[in-house]
Amino acid sequence: MIKIHGTISLIKIQNLYSELASSNDAVIDVHLPKKIEKLDFGLLFSYLQFLSTWVRNNRSGKLYLPVNNTEEAIEYLDNNEFVYPSIVLAWEKEIVNANGENIKGELKNPSKEYFNRMDFFDLKGNSVPIYCFDHDKSNRGLSRHLYKNFRELVNETTLGFNLFNAFKKVGDFNKGVFRTGVKGHYDDFIAIIHELFTNTHEHAKTNELGYNLYPNIRALQLKFHKKPINKFVEQFQDYAGLVQYFNSGFNVNPQGDLYLLEISILDSGPGFVKRYKRISDYNLNIAEEVEIIKQCLYRHNTSADGFRGEIKGIGLDRVLQTLDGKGFVRIKTGRADVFRDMRNNRYHHHDNASEIQLNDFQNNSKSNFTVYPAAEGTLLSIFYPLEFNQP
């Protein structure tokens, strides 16, 4: 049994992977908390990446919700943004209440209603999630904001139009910041989202052998963060790379608050390493894994064939260029968890991929990378400062 606590953090999520990998249980159930107290940078999608890893584990069992009846279950779903994607990801499992009773049938219609509200950016809070679930070949789980006729990805121009109200919702906290910070960089945000989501469409719907993945999640989250710099530093004091990023001289509002936009993209596909090498096991060392991530970030490198294949390398390289001088990007895939601080480590096109600098997310090292239990898929979480004045 794995119990997820309401005080979950990035470090505690890493511990969940270790707990899953080392468990001697024949069947591993997961118990969800009544609420998650703080959904900070990348936390929601980090949790969902773990849950995807659990779902794919051949010992995964039941998903327990801390509710006693249907009324409580609906309220729990409506008031906690981590619940809906958890239910959909675990739909092939037993989903039970605190008494061990299967409540999946009672959750079907409330989940559809939740999806409809999400589709109109009408959920509570200042976070905007957009989920695509690959259930089967019907494409019924795809977002109309990202797909045309629920089959083809929309182009960049259409995406910008489709997501305008999503960004507007994120900007509701402060209309002035939305106008100057978000709208001033809107094309940048859309470019990042389009490139990264295109990669999930092309490389994360099938496994490394080309077989369709069901169930499978591909998702986008937009989230606004506002805190004084010292509070960000305090919050991420265990991550030297983030501390350095926050101490790099941002322009703040008159109250001393830094405004940040988080853009997170998640998929539960094979991940960079398995896809690029077409391997099913991690029979290589961590330095080689990080090298493969660099290859995926390198212009013109690709694991796919044909014209669209070439776009993969260009796309991820373009993301780094778009973030240059501004953003912070974390990449968690396979057994690696790395980052690139584009503010303190500016973009430069290198002659070979090995020269691209990536740091370990936990220890900040450029060469001594932590080996974690393998995670399914790929998570990219980006911090982008609003009202940043380029020097």
Where are these regions (language model features)?
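Conserved ATP-binding N-box helix of the HATPase_c
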Residues: G181-P254, D317-L323
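Short, glycine-/small-residue-enriched flexible loop/hinge segments at domain edges that mediate gating
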Residues: A26-D40
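Acidic ATP/Mg2+-coordinating residue in the GHKL
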Residues: D267
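Short beta-strand element(s) in the Bergerat
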Residues: Y259-I263, T378
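Short beta-alpha junction loops
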Residues: I36, G61-I74, R335-D337
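Helix-loop-beta hinge of the Bergerat
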Residues: V154-F178, S280-S303
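Flexible, glycine-/charge-rich segments associated with ATP-binding catalytic modules
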Residues: M1-D25, R56, E81-G100, G105-K137, ...
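Conserved short strand/loop->alpha-helix "switch" segment adjacent to the catalytic nucleotide/phosphoryl-transfer site
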Residues: I2, I36-G42, K168-H194
